[in-house]
Amino acid sequence: TVFKGVDKSLAMELYKHCRKKSQITILYNSPRNGQKEFQIITDKVEFSNGKLYLYGTGLDYKQYTYFPVGRILKVLSVSLKKSEVEDIKTYKVGYELSSNSASARLCDEETIKEIKDDNTVVVEYVSSNLFMIKQKILSYGSSCKVLYPEFVKDEILQTLNSMKAGYLNGKA
């Protein structure tokens, strides 16, 4: 079931906060660091890869972020006044998708910039969370080619090379 490990009343509470774009403090059970508090200006609750996530602007790292709802223990507080979030660095990444990725779903931060004659589409993804951008690009596999910026191309290639090395080392 998709709600496995998810407190349904907590999920509904988070959904209501998202409708109001509330600023809340959550208690999160991190797999690496244990329980930790995070402040977030809520945006949406949405399914991705069969799991329910809370999305919003995290005030700790000043970037758009997401948390698996199953790891959120509770909402600790709701701020009456939202913090002004300034100096959020955003990344603009362009990539080309081939027709093999016809089932691709674009998120709110992605825009189609060009539809080419060879059945490819140029997409631009703008977000403050570079990890989310890279994760999305890698999910397309060989149907996707990063166009810009150069440092993202390099990081994607580095990730793919380390994945390849991991597979090759496993076969030794």
Report residues per predicted region.
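Short aromatic-glycine-enriched beta-strand elements
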Residues: 51-55
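Short, mixed charged/polar active-site loops
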Residues: 34-39, 62-64
